């Protein structure tokens, strides 16, 4: 618990829960594209997942900002650091997704937008995490430097894409 200001910082995985939650509705969006599910059924099925993800992401950003304000040397609530921005951008997309789902529930419309935002939220979460943890973007959150780390992550991603591309499709 080194460096914690108060009891609210004992649970430090809020942003992670928000990011992982986005993988659920990302998968649902891909499944909806394949199965041609009814648009309103799709909106209802992912609404609670998006809301839970958005809640944890919001709490994570707020508690992190309050912690940064009280921690010496951080200088304020928000520093516009790459790590902070990589959590804020998926939050903006999640907020737009939540609003689009509410519109889609009430009337037919924005189905394509909901699909795109579902995919974009997860993609931004993964890309942001890759950029700040690979060492490509330097930040005040960077505590260790290892130039091979980014190459390892990128190689792993390329390998996974190649395996998925070359695997036989189910019939």
Language-model region placement:
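Single conserved hydrophobic/aromatic residue that forms the stacking wall/gate
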Residues: 1-6, 165-170
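Membrane-interface interhelical loops and short amphipathic "cap" helices
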Residues: 7-8, 12, 38, 63-86, ...
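A conserved hydrophobic secondary-structure block that centers on an alpha-helix together
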Residues: 7-8, 12-58, 65
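Hydrophobic cores of alpha-helical transmembrane segments in multi-pass inner/ER membrane proteins
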Residues: 15-28, 87-100, 152-167
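Residues within membrane-spanning alpha-helices of integral membrane proteins
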Residues: 19-22, 50-58, 87, 91-94, ...
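Cytoplasmic membrane-interface regions of multi-pass membrane proteins
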Residues: 31-39, 95, 99-107, 137-139, ...
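Membrane-interfacial loop-to-helix junctions in multi-pass inner-membrane proteins
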Residues: 34-55, 103-119, 147-151
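Conserved active-site neighborhood of enzyme catalytic/cofactor-binding cores
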Residues: 62-66, 75-76, 82-123, 127
């Amino acid at each position: 618990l080194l460096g914690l200001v108060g009891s609210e910082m004992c649970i430090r995985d809020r942003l992670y829960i928000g990011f992982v939650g986005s993988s659920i509705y990302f998968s649902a969006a891909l499944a909806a594209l394949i199965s041609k599910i009814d648009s309103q059924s799709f909106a209802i099925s992912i609404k609670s997942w998006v809301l839970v993800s958005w809640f944890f992401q919001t709490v994570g950003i707020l508690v992190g900002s309050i912690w940064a304000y009280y921690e010496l040397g951080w200088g304020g609530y928000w520093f516009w650091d790459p790590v902070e921005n990589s959590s804020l951008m998926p939050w903006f997309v999640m907020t737009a997704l939540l609003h689009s789902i509410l519109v889609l529930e009430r009337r037919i419309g924005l189905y394509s937008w909901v699909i795109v935002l579902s995919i974009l939220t997860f993609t931004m979460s993964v890309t942001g995490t890759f950029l700040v943890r690979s060492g490509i973007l330097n930040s005040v959150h960077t505590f260790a430097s290892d130039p091979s780390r980014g190459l390892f992550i990128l190689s792993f991603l390329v390998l996974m894409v190649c395996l998925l591309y070359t695997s036989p499709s189910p019939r």
